[in-house]
Amino acid sequence: MKFFIDTANLEQIQEAYDLGVLDGVTTNPSLMAKEGIKGTENQREHYIKICKIVNADVSAEVIATDYEGMIREGEELAALNPHIVVKVPCIADGIKAIKYFTEKGIRTNCTLVFSVGQALLAAKAGATYVSPFVGRLDDICEDGVGLVGDIVRMYRTYDYKTQVLAASIRNTKHIIECVEVGADVATCPLSAIKGLLNHPLTDSGLKKFLEDYKKVNG
């Protein structure tokens, strides 16, 4: 499984990269706003900074919701850096835009996916990634991880090349469950990635080793 970090915070991206396990970054307008990055030019400069840190896939989302606007923004974003993946919402014009980008060799991430049907359309349009939102489905008492598994099975059945990028991951439990159902990628906050390290037996075992070492070596 690949690990992407879901943030626009440069310090967190650098910390995740320094762990040696980071495969990419996902961003969205809300994450940009959280970092106080305003204006188109400032946001695009920020994407370039992220690309320089990770040297890997960085999903940058279009703001437009109409076909022509998404095409214009997507081409501008893709021109910023070869690692940019254009993030497009799963709406009718978005699917059309993904098809266009696919034909132009521009990689895409179909976002805001909440059903197998949406994931099917994204794959048929040639999306590089599809992003089912695990946590948001859980919030309304639906099975987010179950959807990820359903999409994985569908893609394998029909040999679609679109990668399943599990998004809206809230915790380590979500990550492990997405691993178990075969997601290609999990994008998550830094806290969830670091949380995978935590286990009481690791802590107690390390403490015991150090205590025993001191007994022998003083």
From Swiss-Prot:
NCBIfam families: fsa_talC_mipB. InterPro entries: Aldolase_TIM, TAL/FSA, Transaldolase_3B, Transaldolase_3B/F6P_aldolase, Transaldolase_AS, TSA/FSA_arc/bac. The keyword Transmembrane helix does not apply. This is Probable transaldolase. SUPFAM superfamilies: Aldolase (SSF51569). It is found in: Cytoplasm. The active site is at K87 (schiff-base intermediate with substrate). Its EC number is 2.2.1.2. The gene is tal. Keywords: Cytoplasm, Pentose shunt, Schiff base, Transferase. It catalyses: D-sedoheptulose 7-phosphate + D-glyceraldehyde 3-phosphate = D-erythrose 4-phosphate + beta-D-fructose 6-phosphate. Signal peptide: none annotated. GO terms for biological process: carbohydrate metabolic process; pentose-phosphate shunt. It is an enzyme of class 2 (transferase). One of its GO terms (cellular component) is cytoplasm.
